[in-house]
Amino acid sequence: MAPIDSVLSSQLKNIQRTLNYHASNPIDVFIVNKAAEMKTEKVKKQPGSVSLLSGQIIINVHASTQDIASLFRKECAKILVEEMMYGGTFQDKVKTNNLISLPEWLIPGLQHYLAYDWSAETDNTMRYIHDQYGLTNFDAIPSIYNDVKGASFWKFVAYKYGPNAIPSVLYMARVTRKFNASVYYSFQVSANELFEDWQEFYDYGYLQDQKKPNPVNGVMLS
């Protein structure tokens, strides 16, 4: 178990550093031996103990180190971002969730970005979105691509404004309760201006890459 413990500890530190936020409650991780137990495992707690988290992280011990790390990052990101945005208790989450207005792609996109960074698969999907739908209207991209288009937003702001851009947007979103306001107070530009820059960033990248064969499953064709 030592190698798994080392991997999880390292991944948690990386996510906390990216978000500039540390969980106020312990994150429970349970290792199971069979894939079926991923859905059926029931956690037995000691008498008098109460978990304030919305869920635990359950990992299949037989999965590859890469799969374990990706799953852990995704679930950790979900726990940390939800706590950061909505509070650590059930009462806080119910109260704050009704007050903060965020695009439906924002948080799932961040979870995807923190879990997989900018993987070949994510880039392939974003390239397809660019070719199929264009990037003129961010909101017109179908919602089935919320994870990827959201991840593309976070990748762009981190590239343009630096690593502190991610926690800045999240913090200002919680304070102002509005996405557009969080963008303005974080970067002193309007959301429309930011998405124009986002479009230019990806248009330029993919247009420069047009002469190269499209990758298939992350493998570049010769």
Set out the residue ranges of the language-model regions.
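Zn2+-dependent metallopeptidase catalytic core
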Residues: 1-29, 73-76, 80-83
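Beta/coil-rich, acidic/histidine-enriched accessory regions frequently appended to metallopeptidases
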Residues: 7-10, 175-222
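Surface-exposed patches in mature extracellular/periplasmic domains of secreted proteins
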Residues: 14-30, 88-93, 124-127, 164-170
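Active-site-proximal alpha-helical
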Residues: 15, 105-106, 110, 114-121, ...
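Charged, often glycine-rich, active-site loop that binds/positions anionic groups
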Residues: 35-51
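Zinc-dependent metallopeptidase catalytic helix centered on the HExxH motif
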Residues: 49-121, 167
